[in-house]
Amino acid sequence: MVKPTGPTDVNVRKLIRQLEKTKRPIFKYIAELLSKPKRRKKHFVVNLWKIEKHSNDGDTIIVPGKVLGSGELTKDVKVVALSFSQTALEKLKDKAIYLENFVEQAKDKKLPNTKILI
């Protein structure tokens, strides 16, 4: 039988538990994605051009992985991710929000126009 694996980073484990406690379906789905083994999360890396392609003005885009800085983002969107590359942070400036901070801010708020990009 295969040994179950998951994230070894303590901070990611805490985040998964925090997401599961919120009891919101979107956060539970993100927790499920984050608890997958690393070999199955390689495609959780998203470039800015993909966010530009799949978003509209006013959207909140959640990436359960890393955002890279390839491409440009001209639309007015908030980008929430587990981590950002340095070039992505420079291009996004105040539009970038870390997932831990977003969960604390959005516990009791409605989340209209929210999309998960994988």
From Swiss-Prot:
Q: What parts of the sequence cross the membrane? A: none
| Record's keyword terms, sorted | Ribonucleoprotein, Ribosomal protein
Under Gene3D superfamilies, the record lists: 3.100.10.10
Instruction: Cite a single GO BP annotation.
Output: translation
Q: Which GO terms describe its cellular component?
A: ribonucleoprotein complex; ribosome
Q: Which family does it belong to?
A: Belongs to the eukaryotic ribosomal protein eL18 family.
Q: Which gene encodes it?
A: rpl18e
One Pfam entry for this protein is Ribosomal_L27A
Source species of the chain:
Nanoarchaeum equitans (strain Kin4-M)
UniProt protein name: Large ribosomal subunit protein eL18
Secreted among keywords: no
